[in-house]
């Protein structure tokens, strides 16, 4: 198993390019299942564990692909199976993205429930509701979602989401792209990754209006065509790298970005005292002498993203005062707090709100990753901690960050990946 060993106290400086977005890559790769012929060529796909897992799932279904230097070539013309087994789905919740494309293409689909998935007010319910609104019959049997169409093809319909869901919006769009007739989705997620999926489906041949808004209308087509497509940048990786510069008192320029998609995060950095400038597709940040506390509330786009709240919490441990962090998407997404406190942070939880008391002098020690973004927060804390920090179980980090230690090293961080035996 791998760990990251960090010698803290180095100011990060330099210029680095942002990677392609994982959160847009996954639904786009799933959408290739909608075309029964030809070859897709997808650019700027990040080299991540989650991408490899998703490719394995598509290979199991019959797809063929080749991935090299950020370019993924994929053909789904030989896909015959519409059954996604538990052995593959359990590795990643985003595997549910194959439900809509398989159902739309074959008229039936069997997709294992993601591991540990409990029903009730969970996002998976919204995926199933969307399929039913398009005319599917859904049953849950022996741990599988079994979906069938009643009229050969899915039928366009009205989908009104009670809450915003990126995953359910993506699945609904993909299913509607091959449905007969027009589908309107209200309270749709408006995240840039959904916008990218809309452009991808439209380029395949399914017209979509309302792109970038919470109301989407999509015209279904009987067939869709393979295309060449350029992926968008990863705004969460970009925010994490900006936080790395800010927490170490450094300065950084990110290239190949879209500042418009990061307004809430850039505004938070500005309020913290950082100097933020944008120029075309680049973002520059210079850390101040003393960071100011900034309260944030994680909500659907264009508000502050939930995938950045753990990193922001690490940053606020160095701010001159108390900050409040609220997550209205995942109310209890605070697994990183005990580990940050082990490093010397002073963070309390009150009424599903984190109270960060800063500034605190952090001291390096061993800490345990619990999930993707929690891992990133521990790396950020390690960059500013005195002494050596060991971040264990970095396979979580590898799910969503493309060679993060190499990028940080290029900016001046003293960080290296090492093997370790968890049970020794």
UniProtKB/Swiss-Prot annotation:
Molecular function via GO: UDP-N-acetylglucosamine 1-carboxyvinyltransferase activity
Active-site annotation: 117 (proton donor)
Binding site for UDP-N-acetyl-alpha-D-glucosamine: 93, 122-126, 307, 329
SUPFAM superfamilies: EPT/RTPC-like
Residue(s) carrying 2-(S-cysteinyl)pyruvic acid O-phosphothioketal: 117
Known EC number: 2.5.1.7
Recorded catalytic activity of this chain's protein: phosphoenolpyruvate + UDP-N-acetyl-alpha-D-glucosamine = UDP-N-acetyl-3-O-(1-carboxyvinyl)-alpha-D-glucosamine + phosphate
Binding site for phosphoenolpyruvate: 22-23
Pathway(s) served: Cell wall biogenesis; peptidoglycan biosynthesis
Cellular component annotations (GO), alphabetically ordered: cytoplasm
Gene Ontology process terms (BP): cell division; cell wall organization; peptidoglycan biosynthetic process; regulation of cell shape; UDP-N-acetylgalactosamine biosynthetic process
Coiled-coil annotated spans: none
Function: Cell wall formation. Adds enolpyruvyl to UDP-N-acetylglucosamine.
Family designation: Belongs to the EPSP synthase family. MurA subfamily.
Protein name, as recorded: UDP-N-acetylglucosamine 1-carboxyvinyltransferase
Gene: murA
């Amino acid at each position: 198993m791998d760990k990251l060993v960090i010698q803290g106290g180095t100011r990060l400086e330099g210029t680095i390019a942002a990677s392609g977005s994982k959160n847009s890559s996954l639904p786009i790769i799933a959408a290739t299942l909608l075309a029964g012929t030809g070859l897709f060529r997808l650019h700027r796909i990040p080299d991540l564990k989650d991408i490899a897992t998703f490719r394995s799932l598509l290979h199991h279904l019959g797809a063929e692909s080749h991935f090299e230097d950020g370019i993924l070539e994929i053909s789904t013309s030989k896909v015959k199976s519409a059954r996604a087994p538990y052995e593959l789905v359990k590795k990643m919740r985003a595997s549910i993205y194959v439900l809509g494309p398989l159902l739309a293409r074959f008229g039936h689909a069997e997709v294992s429930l993601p591991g540990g998935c409990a029903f009730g007010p969970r996002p998976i319910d919204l995926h199933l509701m969307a399929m039913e609104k398009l005319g599917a019959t859904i049953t849950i049997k022996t741990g599988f979602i079994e979906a069938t169409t009643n009229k050969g093809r899915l039928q366009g319909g009205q989908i009104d989401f009670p809450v915003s869901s990126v995953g359910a919006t993506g699945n609904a769009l993909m299913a509607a792209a091959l449905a007969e007739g027009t589908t309107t989705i209200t309270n749709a997620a408006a995240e840039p990754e959904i916008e990218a999926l809309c452009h991808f489906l439209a380029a395949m041949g399914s017209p979509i209006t309302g792109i970038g808004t919470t109301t989407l209308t999509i015209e279904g087509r009987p067939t869709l065509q393979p295309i060449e497509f350029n992926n968008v940048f990863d705004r969460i990786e970009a925010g994490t790298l900006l936080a790395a510069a800010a927490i170490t008192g450094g300065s950084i320029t990110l290239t190949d970005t879209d500042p418009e998609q990061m307004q809430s995060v850039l505004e938070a950095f500005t309020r913290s005292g950082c100097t933020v400038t944008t120029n075309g597709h680049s973002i520059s940040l210079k850390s101040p002498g003393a960071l100011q506390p900034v309260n944030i509330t994680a909500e659907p786009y264009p508000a502050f993203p939930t995938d950045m709240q753990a990193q922001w919490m690490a940053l606020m441990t160095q701010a001159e005062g108390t900050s409040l962090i609220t997550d209205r998407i995942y109310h209890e997404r605070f697994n990183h707090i005990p580990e940050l406190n082990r490093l010397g942070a002073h963070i309390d939880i009150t009424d599903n709100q984190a109270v960060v008391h800063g500034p605190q002098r952090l001291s390096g020690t061993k800490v345990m990753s619990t999930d993707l973004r929690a891992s990133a927060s521990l790396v950020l804390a390690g960059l500013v901690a005195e002494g050596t920090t060991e971040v264990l179980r970095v396979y979580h980090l590898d799910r969503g960050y493309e060679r993060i230690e190499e990028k940080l090293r290029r900016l001046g961080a003293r960080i290296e990946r090492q093997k370790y035996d968890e049970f020794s």
